[in-house]
């Protein structure tokens, strides 16, 4: 029978697994001599040979069998077509031949489309990408979902293929579609720990706040599955990548995709993306990405930027429009700056009590803000170094600055104690000075007491006169 014809060449099985061990795609042997059909085969045997040729990836024999009359849309066991099988093993040459012979790219079996099969295929991303591109070029719909409401982009995200994800979106795939459990493509990527896919989806406009049916966001899903780097990145308030490619046209996105380097040429951390520092995140959050190179050329840090004055902004080439955005962001931080240079000089003794009290109140409020800021940093700072997502300088630099900060806080404490002692001394001397002029509050209180005593005395004297007069009249 047919099995006797196949000897000598090992072939691998493929396709989706099923409950039955016999899925219609047997592992067998294909004799090279049988690759050329010397005589017509019975229909049943021809179909078996066709399956074996597909399994072996023998494009020439597949074409010969198609020429002999086998339908390109033949239905094998479980309803799979030749194109569906070729897509499941990422055989680009077979996919191209079958499509050129009229195979339907939009075919589905029980809502399992050929495009979904290609996106969840076994093989390298490069091969999968080529197969998906071929299917999309033949009008395969990227938004048709399977029975679990999973779309091709979800399968690509789940299996860790960022370039396939980008290609699907470029051809109209909805990036924020949810499956029967409320999972989006971003949720699947976060669940499986695919950092490159997470970043690509954020570029393409994925909504990181969409929740699953049990109320979990992608960041929470990542945390639950112990992907802490992804959890930390998704938990950032400002997202420097969000929607970066969303506004590009289909042609622009494809062009950008094709000019992207392969994964082998990318850095280990977060694919080809540069790790973002605090300055970059701040600028991206305000839509001021164009200022990044300018500030880096001038070695301006975020701390320096946030303490700049009007003349410094202008001097460093920052336009008025950009200045307004930065100043508005500073205002939202609700950090009140004390302008010590505008206070009267203490040495001139011209400062009023109200001004001095206002100065002390502002100083106290500012210290409160600083304490709160440091407490927030302590609470948010990752405990372990491997959890840090953003690009950091050497820890020694941070330690050195903290040591200087501690020294300045100690100096401030010492100076405030001196100020307190001086104020107490002045107060004691004033109270003991005979020439001391009472405050208005003190004078007012004394006058009030005198008036009360005078009024009581007059009333008492008047009452005494009334009693005396009444006594004389009776006598």
UniProtKB/Swiss-Prot annotation:
Specify where it is mainly localized: cytoplasm
Q: Which residues form a coiled coil?
A: none
Which residue ranges does the record assign to the SAM domain?
A: 272-334
Q: Name one GO cellular component term.
A: chromatoid body
> In terms of domain of life, where is this protein from?
Eukaryota
GO-annotated biological processes: cell differentiation; male meiotic nuclear division; regulatory ncRNA-mediated gene silencing; spermatogenesis; transposable element silencing
Checking PROSITE patterns in the record gives:
ANK_REP_REGION, ANK_REPEAT
Q: Does the keyword Transmembrane apply?
A: no
- Residues bearing PTM Phosphoserine: 17-18, 20
Q: What is this protein called?
A: Ankyrin repeat, SAM and basic leucine zipper domain-containing protein 1
Q: What is the lineage of its organism?
A: Eukaryota, Metazoa, Chordata, Craniata, Vertebrata
Gene name of the encoded protein:
ASZ1
């Amino acid at each position: 029978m047919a099995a006797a014809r196949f000897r000598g060449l090992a072939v691998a099985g493929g396709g989706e697994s099923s409950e039955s061990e016999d899925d219609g795609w047997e592992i067998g042997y294909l004799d090279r001599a049988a690759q050329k059909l010397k005589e017509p085969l019975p229909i049943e045997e021809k179909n078996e040979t066709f399956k074996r040729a597909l399994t072996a990836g023998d494009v020439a024999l597949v074409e010969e069998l198609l020429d002999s009359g086998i339908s390109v849309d033949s239905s094998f066991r479980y309803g799979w077509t030749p194109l569906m099988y070729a897509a499941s093993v990422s055989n680009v040459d077979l996919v191209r031949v079958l499509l050129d012979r009229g195979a339907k790219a939009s075919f589905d079996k029980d809502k399992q489309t050929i495009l979904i099969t290609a996106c969840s295929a076994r093989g390298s991303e490069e091969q999968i990408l080529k197969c998906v591109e071929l299917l999309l070029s033949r009008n395969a719909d990227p938004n048709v979902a399977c029975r679990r409401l999973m779309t091709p982009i979800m399968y690509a995200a789940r299996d860790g293929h960022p370039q396939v994800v980008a290609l699907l979106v470029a051809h109209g795939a909805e990036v924020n579609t949810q499956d029967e459990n409320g999972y989006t493509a971003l949720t699947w990527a976060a669940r499986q720990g695919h950092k490159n896919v997470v970043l690509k989806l954020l570029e393409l406009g994925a909504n990181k706040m969409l929740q699953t049916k049990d109320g979990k966001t992608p960041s929470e899903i990542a945390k639950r599955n112990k992907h802490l780097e992804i959890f930390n990145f998704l938990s950032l308030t400002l997202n420097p990548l969000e929607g970066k490619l969303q506004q590009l046209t289909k042609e622009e996105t494809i062009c950008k995709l094709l000019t992207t380097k392969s994964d082998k040429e990318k850095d280990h951390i977060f694919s080809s993306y540069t790790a973002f520092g605090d300055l970059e995140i701040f600028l991206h959050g305000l839509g001021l990405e164009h200022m990044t190179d300018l500030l880096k050329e001038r070695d301006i840090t975020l701390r320096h930027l946030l303490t700049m004055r009007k003349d410094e902004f202008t001097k460093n080439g920052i336009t008025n429009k950009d200045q307004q955005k930065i100043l508005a962001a500073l205002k939202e931080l609700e950090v009140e700056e004390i302008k010590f240079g505008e206070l009267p000089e203490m040495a001139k003794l011209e400062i009023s009590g109200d001004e001095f009290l206002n100065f002390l109140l502002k100083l106290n409020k500012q210290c409160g803000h600083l304490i709160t800021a440091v407490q927030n940093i302590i609470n948010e700072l990752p405990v372990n170094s491997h959890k840090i997502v953003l690009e950091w300088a050497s820890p020694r630099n941070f330690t050195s600055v903290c040591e200087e900060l501690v020294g300045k806080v100690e100096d401030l404490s010492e100076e405030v104690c001196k100020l307190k002692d001086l104020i107490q001394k002045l107060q004691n001397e004033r109270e003991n000075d005979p020439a001391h002029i009472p405050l208005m509050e003190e004078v007012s209180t004394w006058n009030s007491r005198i008036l009360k005593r005078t009024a009581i005395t007059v009333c008492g004297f008047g009452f005494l006169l009334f009693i005396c007069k009444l006594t004389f009249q009776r006598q």
